[in-house]
């Protein structure tokens, strides 16, 4: 299923910060806001972009809840 454009709360699937860092998700751990637009997922904290990836990767590696 393709992730639709919108704003989500993204939660890392990793159980701890070390696992998140090993997978390159430390800037998102434990959660961050995620804006999906035109197949790009942009993660931010306090209005500052911290990471980005394609929407398919985000859907596979994070728990995303529409907000």
Model-based region annotation:
Residues 48-67:
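Intrinsically disordered, low-complexity, charged/polar segments
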Residues 9-18:
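Generic short beta-strand segments
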């Amino acid at each position: 299923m393709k992730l639709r454009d919108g704003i989500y709360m993204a939660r890392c699937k990793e159980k701890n910060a070390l696992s998140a860092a090993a997978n390159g998700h430390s800037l998102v751990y434990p959660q961050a806001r995620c804006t999906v637009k035109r197949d790009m997922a942009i993660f931010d904290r306090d209005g500052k972009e911290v990471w980005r990836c394609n929407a398919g990767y985000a859907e596979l590696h994070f728990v995303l809840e529409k907000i």
